[in-house]
Amino acid sequence: MEQRRSGRQKCSKGGEKLIRISQLKLPITHTKAQLEKKIAKTLKNPGNSFTYEIKKQSLDCRHKNDKIFVYTVDVTIRDEQKLAKKVNNNNIMLTKEKPYEFPSPGETPLLHSPVIVGSGPAGLFCGWYLAKAGYCPIILERGEEAEKRQKTVENFWKNGVLDPESNVQFGEGGAGTFSDGKLNTLVKDPYGRNHEVLKRFVAAGAPEEIIYQQKPHLGTDVLVGIVEKMRHEIEEMGGKFCFRSKVTDLIVENNTLKEIEINNDKRIPAQVCVLAPGHSARDTFEMLQKRGVYMEPKSFAVGLRIEHPQEMINMDLYGEPENELLGAASYKVTHKCANGRGVYSFCMCPGGYVVNASSEPGRLAVNGMSYQARDSRNANSAMIVTVTPEDFPDKGVLGGVEFQRDLEKKAWELGEGKIPVQLFGDFCKNQASEALGEVTPCMKGEYILTNVRSVLPKAVGDSIEEGVRAFGKRISGFDREDALLSGIESRTSSPVRIVRDQELTANMAGIYPCGEGAGYAGGITSAAMDGIKVAETVCRKYAAIKNN
């Protein structure tokens, strides 16, 4: 018996027929041989050889003393249809493995290389697939290459020197590079883009387990290497990267894109521009508004980061303070408040850090980040509350941007440029904290004890207090007095949506809004999927440059 590596696929043109087995339950200490034995026993087929691929692995901790992994596997075996009928088991079914297929090029001549604005997941994946198909894309990134960017960010955390163009938000890899690197998504895609994204990450150096894990993640240290590898592959396939190259204007004639201005100076001709600027490209949104690109305000969420000892979270989920096999435990919680608003955890970082994620002078924002090992002493997540355009009426399309900036300015002034921190007990009393309890911060960037609640709108502060107390009834100790709150968490998603039609173009020909910044994704995987989707659209219309 042989386990087919999850990152590989053997597929005939029409797809390979397989037997899918779900609900295979094994102790968390099981071996590969035990899994194979379980598969053979389930199929009532102890003799014949087979190959299998793990499609999903989830953890069941409902019984703390009997924690198990639950698997779904696809099995390749002779006479699979006959065998499936023979075995009377509701957890066994025939399935067909259909590989992802990128479309064939169209016929419209492409006179200039397509330009991609931004090298986050959306821009990077769009660029990779266009390069592979022969379109020689040009990727414009306002920030630095990943390795240089990492040093710039670390210098900011250490010395407080902010580079507005290369920071936690801007630079190769996008904002997700300095996060937990979560890869799970709620987006259901019948075309297989989700699996394709994970495969591409594995090919670029990610652990193969992300293909089937219930909650896959990469970590900042791994992500840096992955985006560098993808950049080199794009360049080898004919693509070009231009760093420190901010798009400052779009030159449009007769409602059609003609040129792109870079750094208020250089202009390049452009027939296709994929706009994937990220959710923090506020100056880009302002430029687009001036140029008449249709945008609309959208809901997003704001709040604070909360820190607890990781051992406390482990105890609640695992029943033990540490488990080497399972790593740091995570949680996901939601609550509907008495005031009608919802409060929920976001971007939970097991064994992670709260980081200063600012990108504008005089304004302060935070985010959560983990390394691959998730081995810091604290767990953190955002406690956020949804805000809608009704919370900033009469402010126009960029009202959400103004709302974010106002909160970040107050946070910067409150902390004098440092991350404002407050104990939950003091938060409930609306008073400044003066001393830490047993929980000590795990932070990147300097912090200061103060009254962070004073920054928040009353409805948001009240919702967070009620939510944390409610979560304390589900996770023991969540509402402890010395849990740490810090802020402001304001960059959860884009405050605008750049309107696009069924052909994925804006109201001006040649402009393709894409990814999280354009309002069509939320997180690394969904942004990458949208990048592939836009690349497909460009490909279906235009002929490849290498074949011209």
Where are the language model's segments positioned?
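Residues forming the flavin
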Residues: 16-69, 73-548
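Short, Lys/Arg-enriched N-terminal segments with co-localized hydrophobic residues
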Residues: 4-17
